[in-house]
Amino acid sequence: MLGKTVLLPLLVLLCHSLASASLVYRGADISSLLIEEKAGIEYKNVNGQTQPLENILKANGVNSVRQRVWVNPSDGSYNLDYNVKLAKRVKAAGMSVYLDLHFSDTWADPSHQTTPRGWSTNDIGTLTWQVYNYTMEVCNTFASNGIDVSIVAIGNEIRNGLLWPLGKPDNYANIANILHSAAFGVKDSTLSPKPKIMIHLDNGWDWSAQKFFYDRVLSSGANLVKSDFDLIGVSYYPFYNPSATLSALTTSLKNLRSTYGKDVLVVETDWPVLCPNPAYAFPSDLKDIPFSVAGQTTFVQRVANIVAQTPGGIGLYYWEPAWVQNAALGSSCADNLMVDWSTRQARTSLSVFATI
């Protein structure tokens, strides 16, 4: 009886430990942090104590930070120097760095993939050389600053291509050559160990769209081959399309893994605490989750479970949980943050990362 009494708590602790360690990457994108701090924003932990945001995240189970990198933004936001400063703090807090290369001077997404100033818009050979050199420069700069990088995404949400007009989806050979050049910019850099190389598309729940892209870019007759990249990342937002069900995400991630043999991650996701007038109906299998702090916890746990139960499912990143000057995060939902926008205090939902 004594043996059972001792073993049972140990088994409970072991199971909890295994559950907590199921995802390799438990992350958040906090790219806006330095801009927020410049505006005078200070963050507080759940107990109301002022602390650096990266320390608050680490204490709540976050082990990796995603950073967007722009080429030559007019005001310096998210440029290489900005990201080196942020990454030094991330590493000092004991978390890994994931660089999200937009290959643009501004936002890159399915609706915008603007070629940086000074890069070619009419010669693919010149453009791919510029992509290679820039990617290697970014990686070498991190290496020279003593900053290890775990993941480099070569493009952001590139389902509709990248570096327009040459990289538009009417020419998958161009897209493939751009991605090949970017991948070798990472491989030929001085970073050691080498980062994992990721391709990242939006609408991660839409298997047909994912398959359409990868089948074409890998069969275009250009240079890109499967061995050029290691990871497939997807965005999964619940508030842009009622078809974005958890069931559809499950199918898509499993098919991505089985078809292309890559580890898979959800690298952007959010859940609202306030959404009185959503622009679109929410997916049917998410309607039981409330728009609340508790709802954020439930949502992240459900998505994390789907990733963890997918063979090769290794990570989840919440997008901009602390961007208090932009609580809607571009959606029709008024507040998607894990930090209260008015008090700057961490919400209890932030601790969900310690459970996934």
From Swiss-Prot:
PANTHER family according to UniProt: ARABINOGALACTAN ENDO-BETA-1,4-GALACTANASE A
Claim: Signal is one of the keywords in the record: yes
Lineage, opening ranks: Eukaryota, Fungi, Dikarya, Ascomycota, Pezizomycotina
One cellular component (GO) term of this entry: extracellular region
Catalysis: reaction(s): The enzyme specifically hydrolyzes (1->4)-beta-D-galactosidic linkages in type I arabinogalactans
GO terms for biological process, alphabetical: cell wall organization; pectin catabolic process
Subcellular localization: Secreted
Glycosylation, residue list: 133
Protein origin, superkingdom: Eukaryota
Molecular-function GO terms, alphabetical: arabinogalactan endo-1,4-beta-galactosidase activity; glucosidase activity
Family that this chain belongs to: Belongs to the glycosyl hydrolase 53 family.
Record-linked InterPro entries: Glyco_hydro_53, Glycoside_hydrolase_SF
Record keyword Iron present: no
Keywords attached to this entry: Carbohydrate metabolism, Cell wall biogenesis/degradation, Glycoprotein, Glycosidase, Hydrolase, Polysaccharide degradation, Secreted, Signal
Entry EC number(s): 3.2.1.89
Active-site residues from the entry: 157 (proton donor), 268 (nucleophile)
SUPFAM superfamilies linked to this entry: (Trans)glycosidases
Protein name: Probable arabinogalactan endo-beta-1,4-galactanase A
Signal peptide: 1-21
One of the Pfam families matching this protein, by short name: Glyco_hydro_53
Biological role: Endogalactanase involved in the degradation of plant cell wall polysaccharides, and more particularly of hairy regions of pectin.
Enzyme class: hydrolase
